[in-house]
Amino acid sequence: MKFKVIALAALMGISGMAAQANELPDGPHIVTSGTASVDAVPDIATLAIEVNVAAKDAATAKKQADERVAQYISFLELNQIAKKDISSANLRTQPDYDYQDGKSILKGYRAVRTVEVTLRQLDKLNSLLDGALKAGLNEIRSVSLGVAQPDAYKDKARKAAIDNAIHQAQELANGFHRKLGPVYSVRYHVSNYQPSPMVRMMKADAAPVSAQETYEQAAIQFDDQVDVVFQLEPVDQQPAKTPAAQ
């Protein structure tokens, strides 16, 4: 896991962030914006694969689509993919028209069924995609990378953003010879984690690599931000020493 903290500008008094008037104290204060970014190596992939079958009637189209999906599910089970990681209930049938001379002519029906697979062993990715095509599933809709435990990375990013805000405030207070006071207000920016789409990429002049290596695995980034208003207090003055009696 790669970890980094990004510091944004922190301002004295009025900051660039859109703070409401009642979010700022009347007295001296500091506004800081703490941010952090945590990079995680993907450990799961979500596959969406579709079968699209045409036939003379809807029942036949559905039957053929079901047979192909059943064949692929058997393949997945042979590859130790748990049933809870397989979803195949999505099915739709629709009329299939041919258009000639501005007229629509019914030529049959189509059945479309989607299989979604959560893959927890990324080294099996290529074989699962090949298996889908061999089973007659004719469209790979998407392959997205993610992490199995995103909350753990979100918590790390949030804690780092809080630490970053406190560090900025403390440094500014010290620089202006003030004492950092209590927190007056906090504004938290809820960040959304999105799985990263995986793209098969291959340069023409690249050295030979295995088929599995042609699937790039970009890091998943978890960003967090928290804006904090701290009150400022004057540094305690040392009492003047009384001259010693002569």
Swiss-Prot record:
GO terms for biological process: cellular response to heat; cellular response to reactive oxygen species; DNA damage response. It comes from the Bacteria. Gene3D superfamilies: Protein of unknown function (DUF541), domain 1, Protein of unknown function (DUF541), domain 2. Pfam families: SIMPL. This is Uncharacterized protein YggE. It comes from Escherichia coli (strain K12).
